[in-house]
Amino acid sequence: MDGLTCSLTYEGGELVSAETRGNGLVGENILHNVKVLPSIPKKIPYLKKLTIDGEIICTYKDFENFSEIYSTPRNFASGSIRLLDSKECSKRKLTFVAWDVITPFYDDYQEIDFLSEKLRNLRNMSFTVVPFIRATMKEVSHVESFISDIQWMAEECSYPIDGAVFKFNDCAYGRSLGETEHHFKNALAYKFYDDVFLTSLLDIEWTMGRTGALTPVAVFTPVNIDGTEVNRASL
């Protein structure tokens, strides 16, 4: 999905927190606006702590009325959910689409540790969940064969989807694979379209991550990508 990533937290069945992804550790508080979105349940029949990751998006139809002001549905959703005026935000018909559960998730006394089951349980609680397909794939070629089907699904969808993520359904196995400096090893991201932009390289800087690993960052003349000015990128 192409929108703004955020996390919702429920405690005792009540929505208590909503934050953007931010820098990965600390996000921006958007609870005042999330509470006015009809697509987000304010109460759920689940009393344990529950943190849900998802995306704030705008459908193509709802974006039509604002296309002269905002360049893309993504920029529209990102700007609207940050408004100080919740009444204005409520008029913009944003939608939250859930795609993962971060905290342990239980069905009665047994932990749910399969992603497909987590998403089905969220759907039963009236959340909108990301479209997904369960498949058995033993080779990379099997992944590639699914891409055209997923692209077709994206084209038929009512909101922007710019790629797909392949994840292990067994969450415990996925966690056992660990992570790199940039991403978890249990997932493979695929972008549908490769946009090419002409720019000039100005410099290469080095940044140090939390584990001490150095990452080169390209600094280049600004280019406009989906309405956003970009002048840096990790190599």
Per-segment meaning from a language model:
Residues 1-235:
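RNA/tRNA-interacting regions in translation and RNA-turnover enzymes
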